[in-house]
Amino acid sequence: MGGSADPRFAGVRDAFEALGDPGNALAVPHAGEGVVDLYGGWRDAARTEPWTPGTLVHVFSVGKAVVAAGLVRLLEGRFDDPVAAYWPEFAANGKAETTVRHVLAHTAGLPAFPEQVKDPTDWHGLCAMLAAAEPEFPAGTAVAEHAMTYGHLVGELIRRVDGRMPGEYLRAEYTGFALGETDGEQARTAELEYAHPDWPAQTIGTDDYRRRVLDNPPGWLALDVLNSPTWREAQVPAVNLHTTALALARFYAALPEQEIHARGEDLLLRRHVNWGLGVQVEETGEFGMGGIGGCDAFADPAKGYAYAYVTRSLGGFDRSERLIEALEECL
């Protein structure tokens, strides 16, 4: 195990070491000071290359908060503008009144790609598919995480407003985020593995709605897809940002407190969710995003800390929950 932890947070260090994860990292800034920056294990499945501070990790939906923050920065509060004001083709099939806020808060009515995705690297084709789609529900009338479509909706708005692809825009505006990896970044990216063999099937589930939303492109959770150069260099902003725990923790530490923009029983998550602009917001003020596989990042403004945990071992959130419990005890 490498890195450091302030002596006041020795309990967090002990909890991190006790996880025994094959490759992971944890970062916590508190009251403006970096108090935890730990990493351990191996970057590769063969366990020949040790994890380093620069190891990049595929963080799945944790990246949604980053791409959303990029659009929020660009629009400077113009969230009630129609999406079609920036993306005219989007007005098709009754979407002329759909706003940027609807998109950012997962209420745009496009929670799934309407057709099978044959090429996840086809940015313009997938955006055209969404622009032409008929919404599954009128914008603003239901809450449903746009698990796979979110990045193309938000990312295309970034491209229409700024002129750059979302990956290039995020590189220019933030530090430590790789959306569409270069060869050099791929060389230091963690190799994903399953914590247990049935993880993909359990994640997708058997519910028809969940499968339609999550399993498109079909089979994308296979390790030979997720670890492939083609997937890593693609821009799929909803799910394939690569980054470090430290970059995520610093990102959250710099964000202002977040407001709730939509709330209700989320059709995908099957629980009540308060959505901000790209993040889930608790009634007590904490805000953040987790990703399938166990990566997790959030901020707690009331207690003055931010938190990010990343792992290459795809499993549940029990690891992050144990770390958060240890952190709260130290505070």
Question: What are these regions, as identified by a protein language model?
Answer:
Residues E17, A84, A108, A131-P135, ...:
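Amphipathic, well-packed alpha-helical segments that form the structural scaffold of globular domains
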Residues A46, C127-E136, L221-R232:
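The feature captures the short pre-catalytic strand/loop hairpin that immediately precedes
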Residues G11, T99-H102, G125, T149, ...:
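Extracytoplasmic/secreted proteins, especially bacterial periplasmic and envelope-associated proteins
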Residues S4, A18-A27, A46-V103, P138-M148, ...:
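Short active-site loop at a secondary-structure junction
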Residues G77, H124-T141, A147-G151, G155-G167:
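Conserved, well-structured beta-alpha core segment at the onset of a catalytic domain
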Residues P53, S61-V62, L75-P111, E115, ...:
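Active-site helix/loop module of the DD-peptidase/beta-lactamase fold
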Residues M1-W42, G54-H58, A142, A147, ...:
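Catalytic loop of the DD-peptidase/beta-lactamase superfamily, centered on the K-T-G motif
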Residues A65-G70, T149-E156, L246-R250:
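Short amphipathic alpha-helical face segments that pack within enzyme cores
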